[in-house]
């Protein structure tokens, strides 16, 4: 029997034993264990994923051989580029229901091309995108989902992110900054409440549109757009961090609004909003600020990584979904940024290419010190949950997780990793932040590359689903997070990505905005000096 067969049988046996524990008994005849729709789907998904991961395994192949199988871990870059290009100019009539999401579609596809490193190939396409987005700008400020539509914070974020990705002078000239900021302030609501102890607490939130609903998406979209336009200030951030804290749930995650369920997308918006607030509120203000429980938030994030699949789910007891590769994955470095201050901020916004970092490492400009022993590294690598074990071995994914753990450094106070990179012509070295691995980046890459790619191009929610623009965007962004933020060897310029093949490496995304890092830097360096009178052809 093959190792994969033993592992699968052991998993089935363990599952049945667990089921028997909840079977009706004479002591409690009223209790009957029955599968829910979710547990049935979860079981089916795990079986599918296990088959994908183990289909090339044999007694003669090591776990590493299986992990690096080209049939599992090859980025279908060309097919994904073709998928994006054939959909960005013209859509089938069945897409009419997405008429109010046209700015989103542009962003999803343009950003996907950017992450794949292919956006520069078509200047005509860039010009067409800029002209279209310009037509979506509302007279009162902000952008709508299409030309002539209501100004809304969600498509405003999408339009701004697409313009940042294009990054030309024409793209920068589109935005009417004055009207945009006025519109943002019209969307803001500030209330003052009293907490136990008598403190006055200011809570600020943003409606998604005039007279619309307020939730944590609004806070994120408003502040990140203001940040990109360089008008983010204390008037806009006042009380917003308190609103995010009010949205934290008993689980530790962040809900869309106070009292709702924690969700991966809202969690990202919440932690990114705190990072944006911290950019402005560098010193403690006189106003009382509710403290968000960051440890509980991290615990909630860690528990989103699925033991068999390797990807993330967005809510407790829900299925793994490719889009959370970004929503959850990007929340880890943002959490580090909120905790770590300026050093982590430099780590997140340092503009470096893989070639730059590799050259620095080869030249001896990267110094790795205080390496811990394997047992300590295993202890610090985190808890691996729900990964089945066989009688004489581990499942493929559990092995990958443990292999990864064995290669990680302990980052406790006594065992820290110091990274120094040559940063200027005078060879002055400045230490970057010490980043702790809180999710398994290799497992995440395996999930995206092995389970979320469509053979026809594009990426998807999970096996059995069709590719779509949304999942293509966020799966690719999640892949970038796994490669550039998840493991220290990648940050230090190694090729420790799936297959260790350079052709699998995508562009680094800026996790605060979800645009390619080099595009973000170009925008932030040149936006203020842009001539607002540039004429569109």
Regions found by a protein language model. Give the residues of each.
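Preference for long, amphipathic alpha-helical scaffolds in soluble/luminal domains
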Residues: 1-537
């Amino acid at each position: 029997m093959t190792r994969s067969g033993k592992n699968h049988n052991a998993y089935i046996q363990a599952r049945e034993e667990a089921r028997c524990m909840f079977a009706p008994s004479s002591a409690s005849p009223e209790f009957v264990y029955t599968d829910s729709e979710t547990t049935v789907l979860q079981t089916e998904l795990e079986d599918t994923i296990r088959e994908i991961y183990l289909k090339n395994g044999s007694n003669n192949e090591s776990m590493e051989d299986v992990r690096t199988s080209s049939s599992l871990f090859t980025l279908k870059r060309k097919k994904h580029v073709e998928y994006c290009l054939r959909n960005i100019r013209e859509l089938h009539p069945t897409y009419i229901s997405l008429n109010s999401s046209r700015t989103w579609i542009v962003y999803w596809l343009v950003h996907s091309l950017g992450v794949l490193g292919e956006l520069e190939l078509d200047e005509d396409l860039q010009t067409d995108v800029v002209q279209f987005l310009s037509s979506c700008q509302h007279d009162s400020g902000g952008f709508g989902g299409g030309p002539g539509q209501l100004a809304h914070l969600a498509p405003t974020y999408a339009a701004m992110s697409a313009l940042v990705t294009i990054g030309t002078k024409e793209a920068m000239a589109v935005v009417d900054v004055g009207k945009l900021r006025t519109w943002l302030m019209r969307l803001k609501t500030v209330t003052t409440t009293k907490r136990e102890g008598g403190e006055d607490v200011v809570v600020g939130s943003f409606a998604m549109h005039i007279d619309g609903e307020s939730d944590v998406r609004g806070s994120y979209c408003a502040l990140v757009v203001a940040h990109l336009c360089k008008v983010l200030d204390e008037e806009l951030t006042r009380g917003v961090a308190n609103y995010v804290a009010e949205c934290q749930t008993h689980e530790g995650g962040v809900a869309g609004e106070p009292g709702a369920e924690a969700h991966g997308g809202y969690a990202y918006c919440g932690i990114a909003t705190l990072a944006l607030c911290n950019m402005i509120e560098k010193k403690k203000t006189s106003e009382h600020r509710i403290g968000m429980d960051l440890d509980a938030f991290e615990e909630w994030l860690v528990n989103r990584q699925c033991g068999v699949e390797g990807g993330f789910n967005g809510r407790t007891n829900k299925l793994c979904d490719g889009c959370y590769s970004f929503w959850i994955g990007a929340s880890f470095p943002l959490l580090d940024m909120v905790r770590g201050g300026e050093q982590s901020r430099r780590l997140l916004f340092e503009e470096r290419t893989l070639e730059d970092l590799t050259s620095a490492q080869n030249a001896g400009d990267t110094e790795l010190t205080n390496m811990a022993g394997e047992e300590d590294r295993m202890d610090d690598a985190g808890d691996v949950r729900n990964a089945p074990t066989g009688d004489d071995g581990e499942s493929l994914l559990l092995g990958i997780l443990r292999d990864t753990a064995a290669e990680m450094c302990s980052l406790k106070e006594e065992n820290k990793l110091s990274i120094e990179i040559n940063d200027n012509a005078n060879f002055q070295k400045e230490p970057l932040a010490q980043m702790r691995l809180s999710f398994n980046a290799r497992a995440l890459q395996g999930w995206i590359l092995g389970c979320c790619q469509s053979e026809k191009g594009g990426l998807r929610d999970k096996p059995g689903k069709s590719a779509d623009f949304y999942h293509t965007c966020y799966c690719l962004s999640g892949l970038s997070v796994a490669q550039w933020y998840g493991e220290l060897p990648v940050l230090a310029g190694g090729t420790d990505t799936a297959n260790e093949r350079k052709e699998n490496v995508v562009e680094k995304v800026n996790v605060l905005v979800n645009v390619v890092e080099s595009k973000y830097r170009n925008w932030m360096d040149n936006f203020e000096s842009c001539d607002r009178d540039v004429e569109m052809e």
